[in-house]
């Protein structure tokens, strides 16, 4: 099963992907769960990621940026994701296809049809389930700044956030929109309440997936 976490910088998706990977590892065994991230996931991609983040003051051409992310996604898919899925493992990714659609498509204005076609060429599959974490932009950016993320204009993040919301609306068969406002205590999002919601939503889906995988194994 291929599970992805999406959302704007600072939304908490990385925390949720780590929590879910720990939960799944305890349940199914560490050897049956793969946690990865984009950009990143391989030694080559992590090197490119560090270079990309270290030159945040350098404005990369929009199409150049798109092709860089797609190249890293292809590398991660071939070296990590594809083989794990073939082995019937649970793959959890911090960002994937929808980030490209939201950031490069809705945020930067690159043609959405082009992005979808290129993503199809790069991966050929879509995630089985995607959790999109929706959060107030100012709250998210205050957290992202502390985490060292590159800052962009508020207008850019409004476009990206709306992009994620649109994706969730158009692809309800696989996307779940989790609004942080629904899980706040004293103005702070309770990460464990969000985690418990995710686990609850996944239980039935995972049970069916694992049963199907087991029944397909020839003895």
UniProtKB/Swiss-Prot annotation:
Keyword match Hydrolase: no
Catalysed reactions, semicolon-separated: dTMP + ATP = dTDP + ADP
Binding-site list for ATP: 7-14
InterPro entries noted in UniProt: P-loop_NTPase, Thymidylate_kin-like_dom, Thymidylate_kin_CS, Thymidylate_kinase
Gene Ontology annotations for the cellular component aspect, listed alphabetically: cytosol
PROSITE patterns attached to this UniProt entry: THYMIDYLATE_KINASE
EC class name: transferase
SUPFAM superfamilies in the record: P-loop containing nucleoside triphosphate hydrolases
EC number annotated for this UniProt entry: 2.7.4.9
Transmembrane parts of this sequence: none
Gene3D superfamilies (alphabetical): P-loop containing nucleotide triphosphate hydrolases (3.40.50.300)
GO biological process, one term: dUDP biosynthetic process
Record-level Gene Ontology MF annotations: ATP binding; dTMP kinase activity
Record NCBIfam families: DTMP_kinase (TIGR00041)
Similarity section: Belongs to the thymidylate kinase family.
Function in brief: Phosphorylation of dTMP to form dTDP in both de novo and salvage pathways of dTTP synthesis.
Protein name per the record: Thymidylate kinase
Taxon lineage: Bacteria, Pseudomonadati, Pseudomonadota, Alphaproteobacteria, Rickettsiales
Gene label: tmk
